[in-house]
UniProtKB/Swiss-Prot annotation:
Keywords noted in UniProt: GTP-binding, Nucleotide-binding
Pfam families: GTP_EFTU
Molecular function in Gene Ontology: GTP binding; GTPase activity
Domain of life of the source: Archaea
Family: To M.jannaschii MJ1339.
Signal sequence residues: none
Protein residues bound to GTP: 13-20, 85-89, 149-152
InterPro entries (alphabetical): Gliding_Motility_GTPase, P-loop_NTPase, Small_GTP-bd, Small_GTPase_MJ1339, T_Tr_GTP-bd_dom
Keyword field contains Nucleotide-binding: yes
Name of the protein described by the UniProt record: Uncharacterized protein MTH_765
Amino acid sequence: MKKAKETKVVIFGDYDTGKTTTLEQLCDKITKVEYKGTTLALDYGNCIVNGEKIHLFATPGHERFKFMLEIISNGLDAAIIVVDNSRGVTLAEKEIMAELDEKNIPYVVFSNKQDLDDSELEIDSEVEVFPTVATEGSGLMEGLEVLLEKLN
């Protein structure tokens, strides 16, 4: 029996952008390491998309946990950057995009919280942006599928 292809996708974003909620919507079961609702180390889940097993890791967004980004990012195939559309792209998110661009790692941006602010996200990069509402699951799978197509 042929083993299904496996892909590691890391979900980045500043604090409180909806990374964990995005992961919860995309995966049936997830593992969280958190304290009082704040991700401390990482969140993990997996799902099958078009016969491919996807391992999803959500990073902590708070500055004090930034050291975890490098650990979680080791060996990633692709990335999702979740931006709170009501705040716009933060400096931390711009830095992550620049690093992904430098390493030629494919990524997409989820312009999240469209239910709070549906204005168009202003972004300097040529990256594909998907309007999302993570609490409703809106736009998430479409964005993930496009990201996975970039790998093939």
